[in-house]
Regions:
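ABC ATP-binding cassette signature C-motif
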Residues: 1-176
Length: 176
């Protein structure tokens, strides 16, 4: 079982065993200070300072949405949501950069550099196709609409607490 002790000797979790059926909706209730948030942080992998073992079935992923999510000031709603698919965003950006380099005289004059660039472009193209990255904007828009996020160009500094949580949830759900 999982155990958690806070210094000096406050045990909030003692010999906890949990199993969830596929598709089950789970609620965790308890008094203040009883370990609800601690348990969720352990399950999500945020808190690693505990005794015992947490095991997941293959293919499952776990996310954790804080009560007051941290959103980088100055960013727009869309920029925050894109953080959930940052690897795809970075791949698309690199693909654009590679394509721009095809016009570079240094590349045009060196067959080895041209071959390397063509190979990199092919690798990126495969990755883009495999992740359906060409449709990323419509996926983001659908996700933001489904969660009733504020307009994508709104700066997160001006959002209410509920709006901030919806934006953070959208980012979390888009993560792989």
């Amino acid at each position: 079982g999982v155990n958690k002790i806070f210094p000096p000797q406050k045990q909030v979790l003692k010999n906890i065993y949990l199993s969830f059926f596929y598709g089950a909706k789970i609620g965790i209730i308890g008094l203040n200070g009883s370990g609800k948030s601690t348990l969720l942080k352990i399950i999500a992998g945020i808190d690693k300072d505990y005794q015992g073992e947490v095991v997941f079935s293959p293919g499952y992923s776990v996310g954790y949405l804080e009560q007051d999510p941290k959103l980088e000031p100055g960013k727009t709603v869309k920029e925050i949501v894109q953080e959930g698919v940052q690897e795809i965003v970075d791949t698309l950006k690199e693909y654009e950069e590679v394509n721009e380099r095809f016009g570079d005289p240094e590349v045009l004059e060196d067959p080895d550099k041209m071959d390397a660039l063509i190979n990199r472009q092919a690798e990126l193209q495969d990755k883009i196709d495999a992740t359906d990255a060409w449709n990323l904007d419509s996926r983001l828009e659908r996700a933001m609409d489904a969660l009733r996020c504020p307009p994508e160009d709104q700066v997160v500094d001006t959002l209410s607490g509920g709006e901030r949580r919806r934006v953070a949830l959208c980012r979390l759900l888009l993560q792989q």
